[in-house]
Swiss-Prot record:
InterPro entries: Flagellar_assembly_factor_FliW, Flagellar_assmbl_FliW_dom_sf. Keywords: Bacterial flagellum biogenesis, Chaperone, Cytoplasm, Translation regulation. It is found in: Cytoplasm. HAMAP family: FliW. Interacts with translational regulator CsrA and flagellin(s). This is Flagellar assembly factor FliW. GO terms for biological process: bacterial-type flagellum assembly; regulation of translation. One of its GO terms (cellular component) is cytoplasm.
Length: 130
């Protein structure tokens, strides 16, 4: 378990700033990202590199400063999954990753301006994704 403080919360849940990142039993790729302030708020997240191996973002200077990033090795990225009726209908928001500094456990959700990534990227794909 890892406790994480989000500087601005998550889009739609801006008032909730404290979260726990938890392993899911018998699951290597997916994680739980649960609010510690509101019991009924939680998300399933995945590393974007499990979905798109070449996933790449550029952090702006403001984000680097707010999260106190000193090195690219400080960063962990997570993306929120929207669970569908089936796994085939489930999607990953690749456009709004949660950026976490693993040195100080502070994070932010950012919205990428890059049109390359979608908020509805399929969780299951034939190109090496989950």
């Amino acid at each position: 378990m890892m406790k994480i403080t989000l500087k601005k919360g998550i889009l739609g849940f801006e008032n909730l700033k404290e979260y726990e990142l938890l392993d899911i039993e018998n699951e290597d790729i997916l994680k739980e990202f649960n609010s510690t302030e509101e019991d009924c708020i939680g998300f399933i997240v995945v590393s974007p590199f499990e979905i798109i191996k070449e996933y790449e973002i550029v952090l702006n200077q403001e984000t680097i400063e707010k999260l106190e990033v000193k090195s690219p090795n400080d960063i962990m990225l997570l993306n929120i999954i929207t669970v569908g009726q089936t796994l085939e209908e489930s999607t990953v928001n690749m456009k709004a990753p949660i950026v976490i500094n693993v040195r100080n456990n502070c994070g932010m959700q950012i919205i990428l301006q890059d049109e390359e990534y979608s908020i509805w990227h399929p969780l299951l794909r034939g190109d090496g994704g989950c």
